[in-house]
Amino acid sequence: MKEKLIIKNFGPIESIDLDLGKITVLIGEQASGKSTVAKVLAICRYFSYIVNDSSIVNENYESEFVATALRDWGLNGYEKNDSYINYINSDYSVEIISEKVEINKEFSFYSFIPKIKPKSDSFRDLLKSLYEIKPRAEENSNIEVIWGIPHSFLMTDVKSVMDNPFYFPTERGLQSIFSLGKSSIPNLSDSLFNQFAKLDQIARNFKNEVEIEPLNLIYKNQNGEGYFKIKGQNEFYKLSQGASGFKTSIPIILGIKYYNSLKRRSKTFIVEEPEQNLFPTAQKKLVEFLVGSINSSNNNFLIPTHSPYILTSLENLMYAHKIANGNNGELKEKVNEIIDEKYWINQEDVCVYYLGDGTHKDILQRDEALIDKDYIDSVSKSINSEYDQLLDLDVAMQN
């Protein structure tokens, strides 16, 4: 089954009900709720929050894990009376309801009542194992414990069933200054700063040369410093002195390559604005890289974006799949000559939503495997209209 995420009365979101595919794209203007959706999904997929509160399965009482998670991800203050979040996947569901608690006329706060329901046998077995091991860990000071859960349990039992998503924030280009400390990046939440720490560590693992296909680059890390060169050339340059597009895109590619190399289970990646500082051709190649990762490693992606090139590139990959698999596959070889088969994707694995005015609209036209880009093209129409009006004035003056 597809994942589902429902959010109501939370931050800029009034009411959305999203099916999530292997790749889900969110478009919309600034402050439309794209990042809110991305961070809520991250919270609901984070096993440290979910498994640590396994004691609330099918129960209804206040829990601190929601408040902690919102604070960690910079979403505290987004809650409202009757805020509602419901996340469902094949293993478990998480339902969260907020209630306003008024102490007196001058002071009130929101309490959160979560409910977690197992859906798969593997998740039920996971919770059963946790019930058995957690009391022993709490009694034995020699066992390394994270949030009350033994570290060994997180690294083996939990990861065999579920895995944390990896979040690439818009600030990812700043990961090189991670060592300066969190205070060097104002207004950055703890969890996003932790992503910088992971990116920094991942980058250090690539001591040998690795190809960055979408940018036609070669990357390597020496003594904690990133270096790159143009493929086919000899001289390396410091990444810190490279183009902005390199700084924002290389972390994405390294992170995905790293987790693919582990060959464990599929991974969910949340990539905010992958188009940052990239020429349209590079955006196209990056989309191909992401879809190729889905096909080779069964990964999942959530992509908040503003770029029409991201949408058009994804549309072409869906259309290629549709044509190649129609008419008994007669056109498969010819389609492969245009777009490599490893980048094709079934439209059934894709979801595209426009967010605005607190709600959403599904803009994927599945009959034709096309994305309704009127929501972006309307801006072009407005710009063209202004140009036409200016042109009319100019022509009138010439006459």
Model regions and ranges:
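Switch/communication elements of ASCE P-loop NTPase nucleotide-binding domains
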Residues: 1-52, 227-383
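Phosphate-coordinating catalytic segments in nucleotide- and nucleic-acid-processing enzymes
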Residues: 47-269, 341-399
